[in-house]
């Protein structure tokens, strides 16, 4: 029923975000990002309203600082998508075991929409990081425009590494 879904949404908002007090301009960006996140066939489809993902195949966004602290890495993932074995929040995710590729949103979202949804993720789900600005998205979009296809985890880690990523390839 509509009332119970509104109550669930309100409970989720209270529990997961925003994680800091935002000024009026940043709150507007946050709300735009929340709306982009919730669009059909966008982030919410796999990562869920609460950011917990779909275990055991879709990694969580909750308390996920290792993947989202680097602005450029996060923007590249959202623009081009990501495929390959990885560790997120202490768990191993592997395409050989059913983990789908992260969708590439570069052709679907404008710079301001992408910046807003990344800001929403960085300021929700227990994450408390600075916003991503549209000019940063534009810069990374231009730098990666000739790249075709998903980023593999190996390629992304060579450009924007997370310490210890090499061990992910050997985990079972």
Language-model segments: what does each one mean?
Residues 41, 60-88, 97-115:
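Electron-transfer interface patches adjacent to heme c in soluble/periplasmic c-type cytochromes
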Residues 49, 54-60, 88-91:
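Short acidic alpha-helical/loop segments enriched in Asp/Glu that coordinate divalent cations
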Residues 1-28, 89-93, 97-100, 104-172:
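Flexible coil segments in periplasmic/lumen-exposed cytochrome c-class electron-transfer proteins
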Residues 36, 54-56, 84, 93, ...:
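Short, flexible micro-motifs
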Residues 12, 26-54, 66-80:
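Sequence/structural segment immediately N-terminal to covalent heme-attachment motifs in c-type
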